[in-house]
Amino acid sequence: MPGGPGAPSSPAASSGSSRAAPSGIAACPLSPPPLARGSPQASGPRRGASVPQKLAETLSSQYGLNVFVAGLLFLLAWAVHATGVGKSDLLCVLTALMLLQLLWMLWYVGRSYMQRRLIRPKDTHAGARWLRGSITLFAFITVVLGCLKVAYFIGFSECLSATEGVFPVTHAVHTLLQVYFLWGHAKDIIMSFKTLERFGVIHSVFTNLLLWANSVLNESKHQLNEHKERLITLGFGNITIVLDDHTPQCNCTPPALCSALSHGIYYLYPFNIEYQILASTMLYVLWKNIGRRVDSSQHQKMQCRFDGVLVGSVLGLTVLAATIAVVVVYMIHIGRSKSKSESALIMFYLYAITVLLLMGAAGLVGSWIYRVDEKSLDESKNPARKLDVDLLVATGSGSWLLSWGSILAIACAETRPPYTWYNLPYSVLVIVEKYVQNIFIIESVHLEPEGVPEDVRTLRVVTVCSSEAAALAASTLGSQGMAQDGSPAVNGNLCLQQRCGKEDQESGWEGATGTTRCLDFLQGGMKRRLLRNITAFLFLCNISLWIPPAFGCRPEYDNGLEEIVFGFEPWIIVVNLAMPFSIFYRMHAAAALFEVYCKI
């Protein structure tokens, strides 16, 4: 039975401590104390309970996949104008899925409120505050989008189905309750009603994915119609232009307001798309955490400090301002005439090449710092971190598919417009930059977080090699009985003193040389500032590169070269499949970089 604070240690422990630590200095705790019998962390998973829980996980995942596949087929049937499948049928299916999720969330929130006095395990890595803040912002814009859709429905109420008015209202209610649910329960580790909860959570995951796919399809149809209208301007008259227009066949009152609402809806779709995919990822982590046994170590809260990142922030904000200017000029010039369209494409490629070169260089410097620093890796099981890494690689493949398609089209084309030679380095850099950035982010999220703030760590450097200060700290700990619960800075002080002293004795160095080795911590502040600037710069650059494709600046559509080589329909299918993943990659990379910044 472990002793309480201040209890004397056993003789064996005392002898081991005296051998490991210099005289007069208390030994560092080598391991956390044993857990009390009966605690959730102490009891390992029961052998008999693993089979039904694994079966429930398999059954729920298959249920979710069937819901998703069936929903995708409804979306496809509506997109290709299949007989007997109209927009009202699709909206009825999505509304029913949302209502079912609403019932489950209300039941879960009500049951949690009834059991609010119970202590429940939490996954401290899941549902970070900044992530919940981001999803709240996107949810607010999604609710505004729903209001615009309701106003659009009122304007065309004479010829629109009632489901087109019910759907945005249901979606707005679903969004508000889901954000409340994620704020309060994203960190939960569900240990009761696990089979039922698995089906409820996985239903929520794939409902959000279907809503995401619906938004992507609507936004892609709008972008494709605009692209078809611009192709004739670029001189590609051999491509048949057939607009896939779903405009209601009646007059709107007033017409100017309805036109403004229609344009406003499509400008808000990118934020709605990000909201749905973020919600599905947070719910997926909740699903993976059902029945999970957490370890006893408490996760240290990350505190983001925004001092010392002036250079990275200024460079990143400069890129952001340049991005907005490029997008505005691009949207004004593209499609006006062939010469203006070509100049807009060249301008975009030059801008993107410059930004990608800077981002690749920053990522290489950051990875080199990690190679020199040789910090230990965090090998603990973390569903949220694993999902982040998997999403980075999976969504990055969307851009790689488009880039390799452009490279192959340039190599096989019979005639090459002037902007072709800017498209080639741009496509190569997209591949290389994502490769480098993924390595930097993945290595960063697997590093152990800094245990002590920078100012405390610097203070520890100054006092660590003073034997009087170490002895005073040891006596203070002994008198207060806080060998385990003491201040992290003091505990780290003693640990560092012990380690430095032991290394000096083994190497035969004198005290002055040992002091020099201990002062190596001073270099850590410079490394951290450099890494913070790199991360801040990459964060703002990823936000910048998210803006052009999200708001219609898509050279993969507008240069026309790939459509000639691969054919119009095949290339459009490739772009419509890969572009949503490419757009989401930038936002997800920005979120991951923000988390990396807080860890440094």
Swiss-Prot record:
<dbReference type="GO" id="GO:1902600">
    <property type="term" value="P:proton transmembrane transport"/>
</dbReference>
<feature type="transmembrane region" description="Helical; Name=6">
    <location>
        <begin position="263"/>
        <end position="288"/>
    </location>
</feature>
<comment type="similarity">
    <text>Belongs to the otopetrin family.</text>
</comment>
<feature type="transmembrane region" description="Helical; Name=12">
    <location>
        <begin position="570"/>
        <end position="593"/>
    </location>
</feature>
<feature type="region of interest" description="Disordered">
    <location>
        <begin position="1"/>
        <end position="50"/>
    </location>
</feature>
<dbReference type="GO" id="GO:0009590">
    <property type="term" value="P:detection of gravity"/>
</dbReference>
<feature type="transmembrane region" description="Helical; Name=8">
    <location>
        <begin position="343"/>
        <end position="368"/>
    </location>
</feature>
<feature type="compositionally biased region" description="Low complexity">
    <location>
        <begin position="7"/>
        <end position="27"/>
    </location>
</feature>
<feature type="transmembrane region" description="Helical; Name=9">
    <location>
        <begin position="387"/>
        <end position="411"/>
    </location>
</feature>
<feature type="topological domain" description="Cytoplasmic">
    <location>
        <begin position="443"/>
        <end position="532"/>
    </location>
</feature>
<dbReference type="GO" id="GO:0060336">
    <property type="term" value="P:negative regulation of type II interferon-mediated signaling pathway"/>
</dbReference>
<dbReference type="InterPro" id="IPR004878">
    <property type="entry name" value="Otopetrin"/>
</dbReference>
<feature type="topological domain" description="Extracellular">
    <location>
        <begin position="333"/>
        <end position="342"/>
    </location>
</feature>
<comment type="function">
    <text>Proton-selective ion channel. Biphasically modulated by acid and alkali, mediating proton influx and efflux in response to extracellular acid and base stimulation, respectively. Sour taste receptor, which carries inward currents in response to extracellular acidification. Sensor for ammonium chloride (NH(4)Cl) in taste receptor cells. NH(4)Cl acts by increasing the intracellular pH, thereby generating a driving force for proton entry through OTOP1 channel. Might also participate in alkaline sensation.</text>
</comment>
<dbReference type="GO" id="GO:0015252">
    <property type="term" value="F:proton channel activity"/>
</dbReference>
<feature type="transmembrane region" description="Helical; Name=10">
    <location>
        <begin position="422"/>
        <end position="442"/>
    </location>
</feature>
<feature type="topological domain" description="Extracellular">
    <location>
        <begin position="218"/>
        <end position="262"/>
    </location>
</feature>
<keyword id="KW-1133">Transmembrane helix</keyword>
<feature type="transmembrane region" description="Helical; Name=11">
    <location>
        <begin position="533"/>
        <end position="551"/>
    </location>
</feature>
<feature type="topological domain" description="Cytoplasmic">
    <location>
        <begin position="289"/>
        <end position="309"/>
    </location>
</feature>
<feature type="topological domain" description="Cytoplasmic">
    <location>
        <begin position="1"/>
        <end position="56"/>
    </location>
</feature>
<keyword id="KW-0813">Transport</keyword>
<keyword id="KW-0966">Cell projection</keyword>
<keyword id="KW-0472">Membrane</keyword>
<keyword id="KW-0407">Ion channel</keyword>
<dbReference type="GO" id="GO:0032869">
    <property type="term" value="P:cellular response to insulin stimulus"/>
</dbReference>
<dbReference type="GO" id="GO:0016020">
    <property type="term" value="C:membrane"/>
</dbReference>
<feature type="transmembrane region" description="Helical; Name=2">
    <location>
        <begin position="87"/>
        <end position="110"/>
    </location>
</feature>
<feature type="topological domain" description="Extracellular">
    <location>
        <begin position="152"/>
        <end position="161"/>
    </location>
</feature>
<feature type="transmembrane region" description="Helical; Name=4">
    <location>
        <begin position="162"/>
        <end position="186"/>
    </location>
</feature>
<feature type="topological domain" description="Cytoplasmic">
    <location>
        <begin position="369"/>
        <end position="386"/>
    </location>
</feature>
<feature type="topological domain" description="Cytoplasmic">
    <location>
        <begin position="111"/>
        <end position="128"/>
    </location>
</feature>
<keyword id="KW-0812">Transmembrane</keyword>
<dbReference type="Pfam" id="PF03189">
    <property type="entry name" value="Otopetrin"/>
</dbReference>
<dbReference type="GO" id="GO:0042802">
    <property type="term" value="F:identical protein binding"/>
</dbReference>
<feature type="topological domain" description="Extracellular">
    <location>
        <begin position="552"/>
        <end position="569"/>
    </location>
</feature>
<feature type="topological domain" description="Cytoplasmic">
    <location>
        <begin position="187"/>
        <end position="194"/>
    </location>
</feature>
<keyword id="KW-1003">Cell membrane</keyword>
<keyword id="KW-0406">Ion transport</keyword>
<dbReference type="GO" id="GO:0005902">
    <property type="term" value="C:microvillus"/>
</dbReference>
<feature type="transmembrane region" description="Helical; Name=1">
    <location>
        <begin position="57"/>
        <end position="78"/>
    </location>
</feature>
<keyword id="KW-0375">Hydrogen ion transport</keyword>
